[in-house]
Amino acid sequence: MKNKNLLLATLLSLTLPAAIPSAEEVQSSMQKLLVPLRTLQPLLANEDKFTDSDNQDKIHEQLVALRRDFHSLERIPTKYRSQPGFEESVKNVAELLDDASRRFNEGRKEYAWWRLQRLPTDCFSCHATYKVSSQYSNAAMIDDSLNPLERARFLMATRQFTEAKKTLTAALDDDSYRLYDDQILRSLLLIETRISKDPKESLAMFKGILKSEKLPLDDANTVQGWLKGLEAWSKAPAVAEGNKLATGEKLIRAGATRGIDFRPDDVALLRGTALVHESLEAGGLNEAQRRKAIYLLGYAYSQLPQFFTEGWDELYLEKCIEEFPNTQEAKWAYNIYSDKVMDDFTGSGGSNVPAEIKLHLEDLRKKAYGEKEFAPKA
């Protein structure tokens, strides 16, 4: 897990569409999170710093502030909670903060750090789901100690997409970050497919990157594959509202199919998940459709390479298990989820899964398969 320190925690960007009255109330609640988030940034980016006893009081104080201010969102008017997925997102993050804070106070700092890595995931997941009305810039809220990659992650999480693209492009031109080209390129594609959604503009940008001839051969081949996907997207007809789930499923299935080079179609997977998100946001799905949609998101994100949607697969797979226990989709979701977690904690010395995470896996397994399928407790 120590190699996954690029994600930075921030919740500022959970906003509602501008069409909803009094959106300023939600934004005002989010403003309270700025100070504790900025303080925690370098600590959440470095597990050693987070677990250092010298930082314990500081972390405790900021977690208390985050929990208090985020729980205030649970008291917003019903009209906000009626938005598809919003109340669920608030509840998930509130529970995450409660759990991480409790474990941290118990001295289980590594587990608390691991749990808090989900914060930026949940944040950008909301951006991918809801219609964010605008972008903005608030450079003062970025810690000076962050390197360009960490800075870009924070900018993406706080919906400062224009600045994020500039930061990522600059890092791509810097030879000292050549080892991170795959992360940078995937972050750029993520912005293009999930935020900008202009395949012609994206084609021009990535063709320009290829022309620079700075990319390693493997990365250049990856971008070449994206160009094909973007080209197909630019020629695809608009998808009707009622067909988004079905079209999204087709794209996900096609994107997950490995070709002769064993590569998934990243553009198709990202397009497909965008359509599934939109179908969930629109509402009107019956239980079977919603169950399929949530599972498809978890499955699709598990098929995407690392640094695209780190943690998104766990988010939706776990949601599928929690909302639809003892169903076929829940069982599929658990199998993917458990494999992912085991991979995260397996290295050259074997597997070393923390006890708390093992208990969490066991809880999910019982929900996915049903208590009756397990031996009774002694």
Predicted features, each with a name:
Residues 80, 126-129, 171-181, 209-236, ...:
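Short solvent-exposed coil/turn linkers within tandem alpha-helical repeat scaffolds
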Residues 143-150, 190-206, 227-244, 302-306, ...:
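Alpha-helical linker/edge segments of TPR/alpha-solenoid repeat scaffolds
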Residues 119-131:
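The canonical Cys-X-X-Cys-His
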Residues 20-118, 132-232:
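Extracytoplasmic c-type cytochrome modules immediately beyond a signal peptide or single-pass transmembrane anchor
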Residues 245-313:
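Alpha-helical adaptor scaffolds
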Residues 44, 104, 128, 156, ...:
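Specific register positions within alpha-helical solenoid repeats of the TPR/Sel1-like families, i.e.
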Residues 121-124, 157-169, 198-202, 263-277, ...:
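Helix-turn-helix repeat elements of alpha-solenoid scaffolds
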Residues 61, 88-90, 142, 179, ...:
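Residue signature of alpha-solenoid helical repeat architecture, marking inter-repeat boundaries
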